[in-house]
Amino acid sequence: KRPDGQGITLVNIGVGPSNAKTATDHIAVSRPHAWPMVGHCAGLRASQSLGDFCLAHAYLREDHVLDDDLPVWVPIPALAEIQIALERAVDQVTQLQGYDLKRVMRTGTVATIDNRNWELRDQSGPVQRLSQSRAIAVDMESATIAANGFRFRVPYGTLLCVSDKPLHGELK
């Protein structure tokens, strides 16, 4: 912490939407300034490469842990201030701007799913929903954190790094 008592706290929530919900439920009472989710994901677009960034501007909730508290039909909007801050962070780290930055950082829908092995099962259902939503990435926590941020009025955002591409045969 800084002398003024302000600072950044990093929380390793583990894996999965249940952990994300439990952690954010408990952290919300401390009234944090923001919940930036930083993690890894499965890239869904052929144009993505391992190591590329995904900046969520929408969320597809297939986590099933907040359905009773916040129905899935409630939209979870992206927050401009957080989006800009996360994009600037990537800009500073990569030293890229404009089109060069867009080549390594896609913006789009991030789908959060509760089944770690979704790509090993019959893909017709999940893949069709991911395609219809125009999702660029799949993870197991982002939409849960964003939904709880929306629910508790804590600003949220998501920046992920592509660690695998299961639909294209590129694994970690």
Q: For each of these PLM feature ranges, what is it?
A:
Residues 33-34, 136, 155:
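Short acidic/polar active-site loop segments enriched in Thr and Asp
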Residues 1-85:
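Metabolite-binding pocket within alpha/beta catalytic cores that recognizes anionic/polar moieties
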Residues 73-132:
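Active-site rim beta-loop-alpha module in soluble metabolic enzymes
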Residues 62-65, 118-121, 166-170:
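Short acidic/His/Gly/Ser-rich catalytic and metal-binding motifs that mark active-site loops
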Residues 57-59, 130-135:
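Gly/Ser/Thr-rich active-site loops/lids in small-molecule metabolic enzymes
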Residues 18-21, 140-145:
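Short glycine/serine/threonine-rich phosphate/pyrophosphate-binding segments
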Residues 143-172:
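Zn-dependent metallopeptidase/amidohydrolase metal-coordination segment
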